[in-house]
Amino acid sequence: ARNDFFRRELRAILKEYGNHPSFLLYCNGNELEGDFDFLNELTEYGRSHDNRRLFSGSTARKHVKAEQFYVSHRSDKGGVTIYEGRPMTDWDINAGHGTGQPIISHETGQRCVYPDFREIPAYTGPVEARNLERYRDSLAAHGMEHLAADFFRVSGQQTRIEYKDVIEGQLRSSLSSGFQLLSLIDFPGQGYAPVGILNAFWKSKGIITPEKFREFCAPSVALLRFQKRAFFNDEIFSGKAELYNYSPSRFRRPDVRWHVTDSRGTTLYSGRISCK
C-alpha cells in the first residue's frame, strides 16, 4: 500500500506539473534513507510515464541504476562539492565529474553567518526566535554583547568571500553539470543553519548586493586562474583568463577588456585579452 501511494503521488506530480517549462529534473527526495531497490523501481516507473525530463533516485545517497543524473557531494571519482576556497584559483573539480553521467554538486558552500539579533522583533507570529534569543543571552553572559554587530558583519564578509570562491570553482569545472546551494536564506528548522545571504524572512542581511553577487553567479561570468594571491613587489603576476558562458547566445566580441584598480578605484593598468 505504501509503495502504491508513492506511485500515485509520482503520477500526480507528472500530470500536474508535466508541462511546466522549468520542470527539467525530477528527484524522489533529498538525502533519502530506506529501500533503495524500491527507489530504483520508482525512478524507472517515472521514466516509463514521462520521457520529457531526467530522473534521479535521491540526492547525496546511493546511486540507483535507473537514474539519469546524480546530485551528491562526491562521486566514485572524487569530491564534487566545494565548501571553501583556496590560496589560489588555478584549480577545479573536473576529476570528480568524470563518470559519464551528469552530476550536480550538492549543497555547495554552507557558510554560517553569526546571528543578527536585530531580526528578533520580526518574529510576531506563532514562531518565536528562541534560538536567536539563546545566542543573544549567551553572548551577554560572556560579557561580549557589545561585539554582536561586529561578529555579524565580519562573519558575513567571510561568507561573501567564501561563496565567491566556491562558486567560481564550480564554474571553472567544465565537466560539472551544475551546483546547488543549501539555501540563499537562513534555514530556521531542523537545527538552526544561518547559511543565507538573506535572512529567514527573505530580507537582505546587507552582506552583498544582487549586482555584486551576479558578478560571480550568473549565466556569464569572467574567471581568472592564478597560482597565489600574495606577491612581493619584485614578482610578476601571471594568470589565465576564462569565460563561463551558459547564456542563450554566444559572445560576438572576440576581445575582453581588463583593468586593475587600487583601493580608491583609480585605474592602474588596463588592456585587452584576445579570446580563443
Q: What are these model-derived regions, one by one?
A:
Residues 1-198:
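Substrate-binding/catalytic cleft of secreted carbohydrate-active enzymes
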Residues 126-276:
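Carbohydrate-binding surfaces of carbohydrate-active enzymes
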